[in-house]
Amino acid sequence: MDFDKSSSSLVLDLAWNQVDKKNQDFIYAKDFPALIMSIEEILSRGQQTPLAFLSNTGKSVIDTFAREKEFFKIYRDEFKEIFHGLVGKTFKDTIEGTNVSRSVLDEQGQEPDVSTTPTRQQRSSPRKVNRLLKNLETRVASMKDELKFKDEILAEKDRELIQLTRKLSDYKDKYEFVQRQFSFYKDHGESPRRNSSESEQLNLEQNASTKHEFIISELKRKLQEQTLAISNLKEQLQRGEGAGVLYTNYSKRYNPLHNDGPMVLVLATLVFLTIILLIGSMIWVTGGKDDSNSFSQYSWWENNSLLSRIGWFFRDWSDTGVDYVNFEPSSDAYERIMGIRRI
């Protein structure tokens, strides 16, 4: 026999109402087998022998899906599509394959004739609308919760990405520093060779001298970067960009240094250089003459990283008679660490 489009939907509605007790308009995948059993019960009513709605293979596939996707939500309007994907046959064709009589479906719950019971149909419409609205509100709330959960995951991933980016930048800076240090030591290790009769103390002095020269070169590089940054700020202030644009008329009237931004930068730079000169002079004066244990004992200012760099900068700058010797042991050590083989 031929079934119209509402026949399969009628069977689904009858079975769905038996499983979806809360009228949520969806069921979980774990309730899928129960829905299939309800459909078989509806189709078997009035029959002498129970009708087989699905084959054993189809039931096995649905049972496996229910176990693996236990809390997967199956909405009413998506059921037929999911059923077709699992069984490989449309829900309508499966109903027709049971050869159930249409009279059985009419007895189980065919919609009443609108012309005979208009009052009942009108009274049920508001309830149906309210139920649909309630289902939609529930579904929207569920989707909002899922969206909030996904937003939290995205925020966490963004924080992890920022941390990884910072670590990558730190590692890059460290790598560039080690690369500059290696190149500097290697260049000094390629200086003219000395006789093998030179003392070990001279080699130690050369090691310390090379180390201090590298520190001085790093300070010079930093100073150049700061000078370039100051120049850029001056250009921005002259063009009216930067922090000067944010000042109000009140600050222009009562702040005498407002319209003289470059002068403020120059004054700050002079104060900073004056402090460095004072500290360097004090260290140079109190350093005294070097003795045989000068490289094994540290002065009070050498215990501080900043004071040590400034002090050695002025002491090495004032000492222009340093002779360079071969730095073969340190060069060999760097080549072993970096995995460089000589050709």
UniProtKB/Swiss-Prot annotation:
Biased composition annotated in UniProt, kind: Basic and acidic residues: 187-197
What are the annotated GO cellular component locations? cytoplasm; nuclear membrane; spindle pole body
- Transmembrane ranges, per UniProt, are 264-284
Gene Ontology biological-process annotations: protein localization to spindle pole body; spindle pole body duplication
Keyword annotations: Coiled coil, Cytoplasm, Cytoskeleton, Membrane, Nucleus, Transmembrane, Transmembrane helix
Q: Where is this region: Disordered?
A: 102-129, 187-206
Report the domain of life of the source organism: Eukaryota
Q: Where in the cell is it found?
A: Nucleus membrane; Cytoplasm, Cytoskeleton, Microtubule organizing center, Spindle pole body
Annotated membrane topology: Single-pass membrane protein
One Pfam family per UniProt = MPS2
Q: Which residues form a coiled coil?
A: 127-243
Q: Where in the sequence does UniProt note compositional bias of the Polar residues kind?
A: 113-124
Q: Say which family it is in.
A: Belongs to the MPS2 family.
Quote the function comment for this protein: Component of the spindle pole body (SPB) required for insertion of the nascent SPB into the nuclear envelope and for the proper execution of spindle pole body (SPB) duplication.
Protein name (Swiss-Prot/TrEMBL) = Monopolar spindle protein 2
Q: What gene codes for this chain?
A: MPS2
